[in-house]
Regions:
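An N-terminal structural lobe/cap that precedes and organizes the functional/catalytic core
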Residues: 1-73
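Short N-terminal signal/transit or membrane-insertion segments
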Residues: 1-5, 18, 25, 113-132
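Short, surface-exposed, charged/polar-biased interaction segments
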Residues: 24-27, 35, 39, 83-87, ...
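Catalytic cores of phosphodiester-bond-cleaving enzymes
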Residues: 47-119
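Short loop/turn segments at secondary-structure transitions that flank enzyme active sites
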Residues: 9, 69, 111, 193, ...
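Short, well-structured alpha-helical interface segments that form or flank functional binding sites
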Residues: 12, 58, 100, 182, ...
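C-terminal, charged low-complexity interaction regions
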Residues: 124-204
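Surface-exposed beta-strand edges and their flanking turn/coil or helix-capping segments
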Residues: 27-30, 120, 200-202
């Protein structure tokens, strides 16, 4: 297995898909069975229960060098602003912090893909992972939104991920999802809502 971000076959790490420091921000959220749901267009929804804390979820798709290097530095850079926003604390966000949060959002959603989706890599190409690993900034053709979340649900986190496929309006919608042209993801943590839209429109 090679690292999704750099392609290295070096030692792989157990990367936490969400930072461990999120856990203490939710002291009332104890170990429970959390739900992963999968659904393709027209298919029946499939739910999977996973025991344990969602903040303890790890994946082995990234190498030690990436995980302990630039990925760790990005977490530290984003932490001050993220912590305030997750806890619904009033604060301003500088232009630099906005870029940092957008980059962190992209990294986290790409990391969540293999962990939360049975076929996560189908919706995000290898080239997309490599581009982000090299440039470490929001993806080309992407839009990042940040907002205050007031869902009031019992879960401190919620993640939704959808592949996007374009087709000419004079053709029927494809019945089988093959390669996609992009994705849309929404991640809510505490009172923070993050939305990422990324696509490339095919020619013809």
């Amino acid at each position: 297995m090679s690292c999704l971000f750099c392609g290295s076959f070096g030692p792989m790490s157990r990367e936490h898909v969400l930072p461990k420091w999120f856990g203490p921000l939710f002291p009332d959220f104890r170990e429970v069975d959390y739900v992963r749901a999968f659904q393709r267009t027209g298919d029946e929804r499939i739910n999977h229960l996973r025991p344990g804390m969602a903040f303890d979820q790890t994946v082995r798709h990234f190498c030690l060098e990436c995980n302990n290097g630039w990925m760790s530095r990005l977490e530290e850079q984003a932490k001050p602003a993220l912590e305030s926003l997750v806890l619904d604390e009033e604060r301003s966000i500088s232009a630099v912090e906005q870029l940092t949060i957008a980059t962190w959002m992209t990294k986290t959603i790409l990391t969540l893909g293999p962990a939360m989706l049975e076929e996560g890599r189908e919706f995000v190409t290898e080239e997309t992972y490599r581009w982000f690993g090299e440039h470490r900034m929001p993806l080309p053709g992407s839009i990042c939104w940040l907002g205050r979340y007031t869902g009031g649900e019992e879960w401190p986190i919620s993640f939704h991920f959808h592949g996007i496929q374009f087709y000419p309006e004079d053709q029927e919608r494809p019945q089988v999802v093959g390669s996609t042209h992009g994705f849309h993801a929404v991640l809510a943590i505490g009172n923070l809502a993050l939305c990422l839209f990324c696509c490339s429109i095919p020619e013809g």
